[in-house]
């Protein structure tokens, strides 16, 4: 979207706070239903980030695939579980929880250091295609394929990795209960 600077900044802050609050809700809420709805909030905020960066197709794919399919699948899996086991139980951390927390924290800090050490000055941020494409010779499907393999390659791959992780998490939750 081509918005004026202050409005764009306000929307970025609003969506960023929605992402942070939704992510904290996914991790900290003890009721799995509330965690699943917080995950839905996170996925919708990510889709709105794509809309702000003029990636309308990726935003639509994000909404259809993740919010419409994966999040609904997770909510159904959680609803089929026995919800009374999770409402007020307090449990102590096990060794596996500590190891998982340590691994996730180390990955987070390595990502933060990588992002901070990267020289972002040489990267050209453009929304135009890297190839010259004749409008008359290509169909809409071919244009989508060209854009997915050039301009939106990295977001498309990240979306596929997130989808894989979400499916593995849903399968793991369903097997445990």
From Swiss-Prot:
GO cellular component: chloroplast thylakoid membrane
Sample GO molecular function, one term: NADH dehydrogenase (ubiquinone) activity
Record localization: Plastid, Chloroplast thylakoid membrane
Keyword NAD among record annotations: yes
Transmembrane residue ranges: 10-30, 32-52, 61-81, 90-112, 152-172
Topological category with respect to the lipid bilayer: Multi-pass membrane protein
Family matches, as Pfam families: Oxidored_q3 (PF00499)
EC number(s) per entry: 7.1.1.-
Keyword list, A-Z: Chloroplast, Membrane, NAD, NADP, Plastid, Plastoquinone, Quinone, Thylakoid, Translocase, Transmembrane, Transmembrane helix, Transport
Highest taxon, organism lineage: Eukaryota
Matches recorded under InterPro entries: NAD(P)H-Q_Oxidoreduct_6, NADH_UbQ/plastoQ_OxRdtase_su6, Nuo/plastoQ_OxRdtase_6_NuoJ
Reactions catalysed according to its record: a plastoquinone + NADH + (n+1) H(+)(in) = a plastoquinol + NAD(+) + n H(+)(out); a plastoquinone + NADPH + (n+1) H(+)(in) = a plastoquinol + NADP(+) + n H(+)(out)
Broad class of enzyme this protein falls into: translocase
Similarity comment text for this entry: Belongs to the complex I subunit 6 family.
Function: NDH shuttles electrons from NAD(P)H:plastoquinone, via FMN and iron-sulfur (Fe-S) centers, to quinones in the photosynthetic chain and possibly in a chloroplast respiratory chain. The immediate electron acceptor for the enzyme in this species is believed to be plastoquinone. Couples the redox reaction to proton translocation, and thus conserves the redox energy in a proton gradient.
Record note on quaternary structure: NDH is composed of at least 16 different subunits, 5 of which are encoded in the nucleus.
Name of this protein: NAD(P)H-quinone oxidoreductase subunit 6, chloroplastic
